[in-house]
């Protein structure tokens, strides 16, 4: 059994639903910095209280406080994706209206907005179960062009740059310095030196009941508007505009293969023959190198 604990400040509705929990420092039980944050916010009709949470990371989350701590553990880089149990986490998180004045309940939000408008313009960032990561955790050594594009529970390694059109879901992210201009779906990891090009997509495990975990190895390149539905080893390239799924027929070494049979292979370029239209895989002799100036964060 692996345990983790932290003290944080929780936001509760008048009916006791937990809207959020912020754990500023993993492992700390010091309440002194959080005490001034406790109290009632009548405009939002919520109460903020200090909580201390201890969990078994090998077991499934048991309540909302537990679920929030697991998301913090990922974004604080205490646990890598897939090394902490997140079974059933969706059912433990409440749908929340995320505003510039803090989280609000969905029920009755029209009146909540009216009360908050006395403080100034009310901006709604999203209505979702997951907030923006940077509102709770700002990892060292990363750049994020658009805070709305990275969910709490994302794991961003030192040296990662997420450009404005990049996206990183929870329980997913980068294991080393990487350029993210495309979408890293839930459950996906990309390793050191990999470049996810603009508009590129990596197939996740949430949609359609998918169970296969997709990962990209070191020094890979997904070209602009390409897609990847199989794990890649190191030094692989998918050319711009080409989407590789598990069932894609690929000409490799003189015969046709399902792309799934090449999963995890190192040193391949996947491209479409511009004359025949056939997807082919050939040995990669190129070396993908990131611009170090863009990753000295």
From Swiss-Prot:
Q: List residues binding Mg(2+) 2.
A: 165
Which parts of the sequence bind succinyl-CoA? Answer: 183, 198, 201, 224, 239-240, 247, 258, 271-274
The record's listing under SUPFAM superfamilies reads: Trimeric LpxA-like enzymes (SSF51161)
So where does Mg(2+) 1 get bound? 148
What this chain does, per the record?
Answer: Catalyzes the conversion of the cyclic tetrahydrodipicolinate (THDP) into the acyclic N-succinyl-L-2-amino-6-oxopimelate using succinyl-CoA.
**Its family?**
Belongs to the type 2 tetrahydrodipicolinate N-succinyltransferase family.
Q: Please state what the protein is called.
A: 2,3,4,5-tetrahydropyridine-2,6-dicarboxylate N-succinyltransferase
What is the organism field in this record? Corynebacterium glutamicum (strain ATCC 13032 / DSM 20300 / JCM 1318 / BCRC 11384 / CCUG 27702 / LMG 3730 / NBRC 12168 / NCIMB 10025 / NRRL B-2784 / 534)
Task: State the encoding gene.
Answer: dapD
